[in-house]
């Protein structure tokens, strides 16, 4: 609710400064420009809900882009074949990281950091230069959009991001896997005692994260019409910021995919405002996101302490009643 309120207030402020924000063109542009980030952030939500972190997603985007550029431009593979191939590779990489995290009991931060360096290095081995992607399928997908009331054009990339969010909400709240993610994030030991296979769940969580990061890499390659080994640098931090601003606790167990969507939207809103203003440096986006992160982390800590105090007070009352 806090994230939604921040977004609404921010949008109203932008509207008072620039009436053009009322146009559906602006909203559609925000969706298109942040489609790849929104897709990544959905996967990151599941990871953070489980109490983990995935630092490899930016490198997954880079590898996906250069692999597709090589496969389509140099090896003559059709995008319709290359897309599912790279998706399988991405999911397999995530499953491997998830297995290492659970089997070796090494923090996810370390394993995914290693994955980040590994894939970034492999991307440079494939190509150090930006490789343009020229293919009719890419031309069709990049131009695919639907006109909506107000003159806006909802692109296929923006629509795909919204569909991923809807699917993420369903998985998180209407499936056994979603319940397992929340249970592991709340208390992994208790989840084990309830009969939940933490290894299987962890593997699927990181498979989902890198799978969606690969999908985001496909979207990003369509958006830029190129593959580049430097693509996606810092995107993992933007995704984490979106998830935290969206209300998901970094300690795990609490949060929603819908909140993450508004976290992404807030970042897009700030970027668009800076573009409309024309006098502000793009670095103000990072400054604003940093301030919001400080505020939301402080709120999270405050709510956590309040909850713990209430729990302790309830236990004290029960103990006192029992002793009498």
What positions do the PLM features span?
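Single transmembrane alpha-helix segments in multi-pass membrane proteins
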Residues: 10-75, 99-106, 243-257, 291
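Hydrophobic alpha-helical segments embedded in the membrane of multi-pass proteins
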Residues: 34-44, 59, 63, 92-95, ...
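Membrane-interfacial amphipathic/re-entrant helices at transmembrane-helix boundaries
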Residues: 1-41, 75-81, 196, 204, ...
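Helix-loop-helix "hairpin" substructures at the membrane interface of multi-pass membrane proteins
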Residues: 78-86, 92-97, 101, 149-227
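Transmembrane alpha-helical segments in multi-pass inner-membrane proteins
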Residues: 213, 223-290
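Transmembrane helix-bundle core of multi-pass membrane transporters
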Residues: 108-174, 201-203, 224-229, 276, ...
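Short loop segments and helix-boundary regions at transmembrane helix junctions
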Residues: 53, 72-74, 91-134, 171-176, ...
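Cytosolic-side transmembrane-helix boundaries in multi-pass membrane proteins
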Residues: 1-8, 12, 193-200, 270-324
